[in-house]
From Swiss-Prot:
The keyword Transmembrane does not apply. It is found in: Cytoplasm. CDD domains: cpn60. NCBIfam families: thermosome_alpha, thermosome_arch, thermosome_beta. It catalyses: ATP + H2O = ADP + phosphate + H(+). This is Thermosome subunit beta. It comes from the Archaea. Molecular chaperone; binds unfolded polypeptides in vitro, stimulates protein folding and has ATPase activity. One of the most abundant proteins in the cell at all temperatures. Its EC number is 3.6.4.-. Its main location: cytoplasm. Induction: Transcription is induced by heat shock (shift from 75 to 86 degrees Celsius). At 80 degrees Celsius and above ThsA and ThsB are the major proteins synthesized (at protein level). It holds the Pfam family Cpn60_TCP1. It comes from Saccharolobus shibatae (strain ATCC 51178 / DSM 5389 / JCM 8931 / NBRC 15437 / B12).
């Protein structure tokens, strides 16, 4: 590492080209520092990998505790300083946003690839050759997945359920996974849309509402929307069947003028007329709503007490201060339109639901809008005895929803339990001699790194990793055994597809792409220049200001 002086002239005169306080790490030292950062993050995550993985307790600066084994959450909560570590976290977050799962696979594979690259660097193999070999190996790995992946359609409910079960199996909610998997498949199938010849799934249309209390098995799927608000007036009905719903992005209040204005009142009758006029304005708004046939009003803004009174008199159920996102979901669920001007509201703008009802959930009251003809928005109401259980259930459900959506969108699935990884490694070892040279070593190293995932799965299950890896290699020599992986609960190799351990092909492919991209990016860096901290000797810094004041 060098500080301010980083270069010399041919005559040996030092030339300062970086400010004091800056630092530079270059060559092999920079490469090793970056590889060490990748390996350190892998070490932090690998004990959570697989269905027998452990959980992490994360405590933030305020003392708030999070207990989870969700890769994206762990990385998000880790306060990393090293720039390469931050880079890896960004890539992992991209994986989570793209496929909602496979974050740990991407990070752990990146760590294994970094370890193998380090071994090759010690053998004096240039980073460029390693990068080239890794890129060729990545192509073979992706092609292998494409070759062996099984087609899955939205009607293959049994396969989709197994995908959800596999995702939930590695979470803290594994005890309730059978029940939750059914909810996940029904929710995704309900919001899926056929566009052309491809299915599209927008998971924003699956609303997740959390309420502490009850047990995980009290979690329910609502074919509609749950509004976390209560009915605004005690005189209003709490249950409306065959509901015609007005969705308002306008307030049911007397609007104040934009300009500052004063009203001079000389006697009490003028005050009475003023208040009477305000009341008439609100009554007209309520009459306008009632004239459309609406018997439910869900408003994003406020509802005046006078308006509440008139709505209650007409037997209209009303909710105020609903979230904008809830209003948008309600529009999709009920077929209604969100209206910004009450004067423009017509009967064609109303949404329909078989039932709108206020129910008590735990200590709070909520309004359930359900039973629409073909809702394209649904809700999952999560219950749990502890707040942390509810939070972890939400994370588990989001991952499961994402994996099922991935299979529906992509239309392909593969077996888990290391079956895909061992098949990729087998094909890479057959391909490597065709390339020859030093790149062959990089491709073989890639195969070993892929197998490293299986060894970590075995370690976390308390099994002998080398013994199990050898068994799988032997089985995969036979082409008919391509789905053989490791049953981590019995410790024996089994046909993972028949066992029901199924994952989205898209998650596997994206994890391989993300890991390879991360490591090749790291291997190309041979120089790290870090600027000095603010407040040092840079312009405007404290030191410079002190020097200037002393000169004055």
């Amino acid at each position: 590492m060098a500080t301010a002086t980083v270069a010399t002239t041919p005559e040996g005169i030092p030339v300062i080209i970086l400010k004091e306080g800056s630092s530079r790490t270059y060559g092999k030292e920079a490469l090793r520092a970056n590889i060490a950062a990748v390996k350190a993050i892998e070490e932090a995550l690998k004990s959570t990998y697989g269905p027998r993985g452990m959980d992490k307790m994360l405590v933030d600066s305020l003392g708030d505790i999070t207990i989870t084994n969700d890769g994206a959450t762990i990385l998000d909560k880790m306060d990393l300083q090293h720039p390469t570590g931050k880079l890896l976290v960004q890539i992992a977050k991209g994986q989570d946003e793209e496929t909602a799962d496979g974050t740990k696979t991407a990070v752990i594979l990146a760590g294994e690839l970094a370890k193998k690259a380090e071994d090759l660097l010690y053998k004096e193999i240039h980073p460029t050759i390693i990068v080239s070999g890794y890129k060729k190996a990545e192509e073979i790995a992706l092609k292998t997945i494409q070759d062996i992946a099984q087609p899955v359609s939205i009607n293959d409910t049994d396969v989709l359920r197994k995908v959800a079960l596999t995702s939930l199996g590695s979470k803290a909610v594994a005890g309730a996974r059978e029940y939750l998997a059914d909810l996940v498949v029904k929710a995704v199938a309900q919001v899926a849309e056929l566009r052309g010849d491809k299915w599209y799934v927008d998971l924003d249309n699956v609303q997740i509402v959390k309420k502490h209390g009850g047990s995980i098995n009290d979690t329910q799927l609502v074919y509609g929307i749950v509004v976390d608000k209560e009915v605004v007036h005690p005189g209003m009905p709490k249950r409306i069947e065959n509901a015609k719903i007005a969705l308002l992005d306008a307030s049911l209040e007397v609007e104040k003028p934009e300009l500052d204005a004063e009203i001079r009142i000389n006697d009490p009758t003028q005050m009475h007329k003023f208040l009477e006029e305000e009341e008439n304005i609100l009554k007209e708004k309520v009459d306008k709503i009632a004239a459309t046939g609406a018997n439910v009003v869900i408003c994003q803004k406020g509802i005046d007490e006078v308006a509440q009174h008139y709505l209650a008199k007409k037997g209209i159920l009303a909710v105020r201060r609903a979230k904008k996102s809830d209003l948008e979901k309600l529009a999709r669920a009920t077929g209604g339109r969100v209206i910004s001007n009450i004067d423009e509201l017509t009967s064609q703008d109303l949404g329909y639901a078989a039932l709108v009802e206020e129910r008590k959930v735990g200590e709070d009251k909520m309004v359930f809008v359900e039973g629409a003809k073909n809702p394209k928005s649904v809700s999952i109401l999560i219950r749990g005895g502890l707040e942390r259980v509810v939070d972890e259930t939400e994370r588990a459900l989001r991952d499961a929803l994402g994996t099922v959506a991935d299979v529906i969108r992509d239309g392909r699935a593969v077996a888990g339990g290391g079956a895909v990884e061992i098949e990729i490694a087998k094909r890479l070892r057959k391909y490597a001699p065709q390339v020859g040279g030093k790149e062959q070593l990089a491709i073989e190293a890639y195969a070993n790194a892929i197998e490293g995932l299986i060894m970590i799965l075995a370690e976390n299950a308390g099994l002998d990793p080398i013994d199990k890896l050898m068994q799988l290699r032997s089985l995969h020599e036979n082409e008919t055994n391509k789905w053989y992986g490791l049953n981590l609960f019995t410790g024996n190799p089994e046909d993972m597809w028949k066992l029901g351990v199924i994952e989205p092909a898209l998650v596997k492919m994206n994890a391989i792409k993300a890991a390879t991209e991360a490591v090749t990016l790291v291997l190309r860096i041979d120089d790290i220049v870090a600027a000095g901290k603010k407040g040092g000797s840079e312009p405007g810094g404290k030191k410079e200001k002190e020097e200037k004041s002393s000169e004055d």
